[in-house]
């Protein structure tokens, strides 16, 4: 097995103590004293520790095992955005609703008896000494009686770099998941849950070196807001790099991605204006839109027909009651929807923009750096000029391995935000160390040379996304999203399988993120995989084998098989499928791995 192959996580255990000792000794060994026996032994010891350090680097970012495992992420010229929508049989849908019904009934029965025999446990839900409860019984029901059952799957503490593998801090509960205690030991697992799309979150390498240099020069914090004395030269450099990269004339950086969306709309919009939002836009967008005081309309997710219907209605009818025209209309969409794994239909949105003359705001938190031939986001993916987009928003948390967010637009908009946006004027400015990480990541990505490490990461991510998606579909799972998306939602449906899937994958040394209501619709509980450029084919093969085993064990292969491209080869098969008594084909795992590379590169 190659050195970078992912074996069992229990067999990978790099000692942190040895790593620290290695860094203490390395300067001494580079300039050794007289050639004595002790010096030779010390040099041999450091050489061995250096191998351990190199192994640590491979745990964070695996070297590519085959130079052909790269792909350009772009939409074929003239091709319409297409996503095959698969659904389970009615049996699984009914079973899911019945499961929720049983859980709700049991929860109410427990509450009925609990309020009478364990009154102290319900004090916080009732008036207490003149104080009203902060939340009532109904609002708290889901958390107490449903989410509480699978609480051990969420917010698992970790340590170290969220790279190719991640170290989990083991814990246990003695009070039915109300609280957790750490055991003191850790487990190493393949990481398919972090947003580290391009693998820039590393403890070693050019980015880490620049971060260390920035900390030594500037310290850890600016201790001020941008409006006072918290703007360094690094802030200006990163803003200029951001604007150049996304293709807009100016940019503004914020210390947090969530607050970027939460505060930007109150600066741009006002009462009498209108925000039209996709129904699955991120919470930060919804929060910011409500703060703005503008009217808000929602259209069906990625449904351009419904968006046009809303546009025609609001333009013709105007504001409620007065019917006066809206002062301005802003359509807000995301480049890549983080829970669905699909792209916005940007070509059709731009077509509607040219027809109905609204302003366009795109949240590229997950798409910037992750898609497009040069990682330029959704506009780069479709080959559409950013001139068609009025405001581009994004975060540095995902592809850049840092923190914070940005707004990129015309100088007039940026200058207005610079003096009126509360998230910029009053909040702490971005840390110099974070700025150094962003700057070094940008320079890697923007290097257009044939041997560019940044370009390799972008193309590795595109290949990995295709390879995993195709493999899971052929195994029989229902997968949401577009084929080039690095966000891969696998549908579980039944809430009882959320906990089971998480634990079964963890037994096989794989850390996953499971998602349930209210983060997603009640019926479509899911697990969300986020692959990165740090994974190689051995990692993905190990992952697919584990999914195949767990999928069989938990009966998760609901797909019709159409997405796996092996349904309806003959008219008889098509007829059987349409009549509902056709058994979907399932690829064997050996065939999936055998044909996966070729098909991921050619389809």
Curated annotation (Swiss-Prot):
GO cellular component, one term: endoplasmic reticulum
Protein location: Cytoplasm; Endoplasmic reticulum; Membrane
This protein's UniProt keywords: Acyltransferase, Cytoplasm, Endoplasmic reticulum, Lipid metabolism, Membrane, Pyridoxal phosphate, Sphingolipid metabolism, Transferase, Transmembrane, Transmembrane helix
Top-tier EC class: transferase
Cofactors that this protein relies on: pyridoxal 5'-phosphate
Catalysis performed (reactions): L-serine + hexadecanoyl-CoA + H(+) = 3-oxosphinganine + CO2 + CoA
Protein name: Serine palmitoyltransferase 2
Domain of life: Eukaryota
Positions of transmembrane segments: 90-107
Complexes and interactors: Lcb1 and lcb2 encode essential subunits of the enzyme and form a heterodimer.
Protein's organism: Schizosaccharomyces pombe (strain 972 / ATCC 24843) (Fission yeast)
Bilayer topology term: Single-pass membrane protein
Family the UniProt entry places it in: Belongs to the class-II pyridoxal-phosphate-dependent aminotransferase family.
Pathway assigned in UniProt: Lipid metabolism; sphingolipid metabolism
One BP term from GO: sphingosine biosynthetic process
